[in-house]
Amino acid sequence: RLVSNQSSSEISSLFTNHLNNICPKSCKIKVTEHHGGEPCVVNTDTKGYRSAYKAFQDVWKKDPVPTFDGGSIPIVALFKKELSLDSILMGFGLDEDAIHSPNESYGLFNFYKGIETITCFYQNFAENEK
């Protein structure tokens, strides 16, 4: 997972070089570099972002806390680069859900609140003038 000032090809190359440098002489390694996704930071001054922010306020009765968090979703950076569109990523999971682990879980409360939030987002987006 990369941050906004990194490129996947550069990090892949640095990682490969590091592995080759620390590999004991008695071992042989082969690193195959695959495609990489670029990082992306979205603009928070958009109709979509404001609509999502308000949806979280309306449904959860609290202000959302934006974070520099995310996973590897290469299409987000591609949408921004090729279409000049800022994606809206709304998370409803918790740290305790242990995402991608053998015992991953996802609470029904958050599932249903997520559906409600997305519905509210669409309504806000349709009503938002700017």
Where are these regions (language model features)?
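Metal-dependent amide/peptide-bond hydrolase catalytic core
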Residues: 1-116, 126-130
